[in-house]
Amino acid sequence: MVLGRVPVVVYRRDWRYLRVLLEGVRAMAVVDQAILAHTETMKLSSAELARQLVQHLGPTVVAVTAGVRDKKLPYKWSADGGPVPRDGALQRLQVAHRAWVAIATSEGADVARAWFIGANPRLDEQPPFLAIAAGKFKPVMSAAAAFVDGTDN
């Protein structure tokens, strides 16, 4: 018997055993969406990353999220061949992109923007973009996951 590309040899004809074996293989085959979003974000150029965030969140939110004072800098980052965000700013932009993609994919762009700029009880009533600026990456990603999977209700 072949399951996907993995040959499975059933030594016993016990169907309960086969069912447990197949459930284990299916569980291993499930792609973690968080890892997939991380991979897709990491493959974006810094210009494309900034461009998408500016388009959906606006330059002011992107600048604050990245921890820069110049509100025009996100536009400059968006230009091909333009300046590149520093490492700390790029890291914050990547986390913001992952959170935005998770929510926008599930709920839509307008809901994702509202989630990003609104007070969040999981973040002590702080908006997620400010929490990212403060370096609270894990709580923001946990809040985004809770919002997407419905445990935020």
Show the residue positions of the predicted features.
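Non-transmembrane "mature" sequence context
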Residues: 2-153
